[in-house]
């Protein structure tokens, strides 16, 4: 995002306080808040849901999105939680950690499967 012209919130707790704590403790694989998927986005198409639960371990976030990127998911407090580069094979970014959730979460597994499929096509 930044290299493409976007900006960041450098420290959410001090710059953009929220009722949602965006940095959870253990267990890291537990979903602690939801994200709303943007209808028509690749993530929405993959998961077929409007809202999913995610874990969270970040103190930075996208402030202004680069013009060439698209939002795929937002948290209830309005933070951008997932982006993509439209027209690319698989240039996605998520603020959560599907690697911690995958052992118990089918949505996380689907994200990894889509990534592997894009890499092998």
Regions found by a protein language model. Give the residues of each.
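A short helix-turn-beta junction within AAA+ P-loop NTPase domains corresponding to the substrate/partner-engaging
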Residues: 6
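Amide-donor transfer/coupling interface in amidating biosynthetic enzymes
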Residues: 13-121
């Amino acid at each position: 995002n930044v290299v493409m012209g976007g900006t960041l919130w450098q420290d959410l707790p001090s710059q953009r306080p929220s009722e949602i704590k965006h940095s959870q403790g253990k267990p890291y694989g537990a979903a602690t808040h939801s994200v709303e998927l943007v209808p028509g986005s690749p993530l929405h198409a993959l998961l077929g849901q409007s809202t999913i639960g995610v874990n969270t371990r970040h103190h930075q976030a996208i402030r202004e999105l680069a013009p060439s990127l698209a939002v795929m998911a937002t948290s209830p407090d309005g933070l951008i939680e997932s982006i993509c580069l439209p027209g690319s094979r698989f240039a996605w970014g998520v603020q959560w950690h599907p690697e911690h959730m995958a052992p118990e979460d089918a949505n996380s597994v689907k994200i990894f499967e889509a990534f592997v499929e894009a890499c092998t096509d």
